[in-house]
Design a protein with these regions (language model features):
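C-terminal regions of RecA-like/P-loop NTPase motor modules
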Residues: 1, 5-15, 28, 39-48, ...
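Short glycine-rich anion-binding loops that position phosphate/pyrophosphate groups of nucleotides
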Residues: 21, 58
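Conserved ATPase-coupling elements of RecA-like P-loop NTPase cores
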Residues: 23-30
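…and closely analogous acidic/polar surface helices at protein-protein or active-site interfaces
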Residues: 34-37
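Structural recognition of the conserved hydrophobic beta-strand(s) that form the central parallel beta-sheet
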Residues: 51-57
Length: 148
């Protein structure tokens, strides 16, 4: 669908899952294609005022601990291009250790916040199999005065 549909339908929010699929099948350098796509998406957000949530996969870690084992997510691990983090207003990382009994728990980490600059662990989420939703856990896992 084109930009006209965004205006016609008065779209307020778009979820794009995921960036790699958007550019797959195109010929050329992946990094340059991501740069171009991110610039166009940023322009779309500026022109229309929509909220755009974009999913980006991660590069493998350079440490002994990988993401499947709960490794901390960083901006530099976004796969493809630095334009992903440079053009975003906010970047969030989801961290989950699949090798533990608490496999249903996920940490939401703010990696970039253009407006306030506050980054760090935002909350811990727990997957509810009955509702198929994530709920924020009631037990705090961070100290707001030191983790932001």
């Amino acid at each position: 669908r084109g930009l006209g549909d965004v205006y016609k339908r008065q779209t307020k929010t778009i979820f794009l899952d995921h960036l790699s699929i958007l550019i797959s099948g195109l010929d050329g350098d992946e990094r340059k294609m991501i740069d171009t796509t991110m610039t166009k998406l940023r322009s779309l957000v500026e022109r229309t005022g929509i909220k755009l949530f974009l999913v980006s996969h991660l590069r493998r870690t350079q440490t002994d601990k990988n993401h499947e084992e709960g490794a901390r997510v960083t901006l530099g691990q976004l796969r493809g291009s630095a334009a992903i983090s440079q053009l975003a207003d906010e970047v969030w990382g989801l961290e989950r250790n699949q090798q533990t009994e608490a496999v249903d728990q996920t940490i939401l980490r703010v990696l970039k916040n253009r407006y306030s600059g506050e980054v760090g662990v935002a909350c811990q989420l727990k997957y509810n199999k009955d509702t198929c939703k994530y709920d924020e856990t009631t037990e705090p896992i961070f100290n707001p005065s030191t983790d932001f």
